[in-house]
Amino acid sequence: MIRRIEIVRAHINLVSPFRTSFATEVDRNLLYVRVVGDDEEGWGECVAMAAPLYSSEYVDGCEEVMKRYLIPMISASTTAEEFVQKSAAIRGNFMAKAAIEAALLDYQLRKANMSLANFLGATQTKVASGVSVGIQPTIDDLLRVVAEYRADGYVRIKLKIEPGLDIDRVRAVREAFGPDMLLQVDANAAYTVDDAAHLAKLDEFNLLLIEQPLPEEDIVGHVELSKRVGTPICLDESITSYDVARGALDINACSIINIKPGRVGGYLESKRIHDLCLSRGVPVWCGGMLETGIGRAANLALAALPGFTLPGDTSASKRYFTQDVTTPFEIVDGYIDVPNTVGIGVRPITEVLGAMTSRVDSYSITK
């Protein structure tokens, strides 16, 4: 039986600044959910940023929603599936919901002696690892960083782009590393449909995809863009649920989907989107939100499902952190092993997380 829910707040620095079209991150304000029962526990990680720049959610807001609305929904016997049904009454707040769902899943699967990978239906024991490269100060810096990641064994490179820092940089990387390297770009909604002719210039570089070129709300605009750009369009920020994913596919707004559990409300909804795409022959891949090992472990389990045919952003721990809160994930010959023990397969290292933690709030479950 569940006895209490803990909200753990902590802080971790990134090994280097990570710049996108909308922000530069140098650290992460962490929010973990810990479900504590009589003889077991479960952990979930909230992926929201400190400010509402990627989406409308932000980490302090997620904590408030958890405390005021989501945790009071949980009883001693609530399962992840039941929580998803109950929390549907609260609009949006997908990242807050996803963190609690993940902790409940970890808890109940540990009690059932089952791994998250097996629960979701994973068919792979390791997943191909790609890496996301932030916008660099110069092209020379970009080439140096890409070379380092290639040396580390990453099988796919993703370049963050924005207007004015796109075509020349992609050309430089393609020329430096050859036509066979798996390469894609991510705009994080930095362009408009009026930029279609400009984005079409990317077609010559044989990219896997262009990720989220237009604003989140402009799904219809992506339909028009898909007609004018030869490179496959992948949606990220726009896809916030199964229903949105189905609608986007129905109108041909994209031909690839990036599934991020935090963005869609959790791993159960992520699996529904995966199953939809698999049934339609639409490739998916697992995106990243600079997760520590707790979130990364769960993402690896998801990325091991059969429809995840493109390398995701499930990079090694050292890509982002000098010291992760869990035993670090390592890349070996381009792949990262999927945790195969119970639950998400990892737990935080008590001493490490303790040194990073600023506050732990505990909420008793009495009903």
What are these regions (language model features)?
Residues 5, 322-367:
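C-terminal extensions of enzymes
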Residues 46, 131-133, 159-161, 185-189, ...:
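A cross-domain feature marking catalytic cores of carbohydrate-active enzymes
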Residues 1-9, 110, 114-126, 329, ...:
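N-terminal amphipathic alpha-helix/helix-capping segment at the start of soluble metabolic enzymes
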Residues 217-234, 239-335, 339:
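Shared catalytic-loop signature of beta/alpha-barrel
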Residues 1-41, 47-54, 320-322, 363:
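Structured beta-strand/loop patches that form or line metal/cofactor-binding pockets in enzymes
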Residues 117-229:
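Metal-dependent enolase-superfamily TIM-barrel catalytic cores that perform enediolate-based chemistry
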Residues 33, 39, 100, 113, ...:
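Conserved, mostly hydrophobic/aromatic
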Residues 4, 35-36, 41-111:
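Metal- or metallocofactor-binding catalytic centers and their adjacent structured scaffolds
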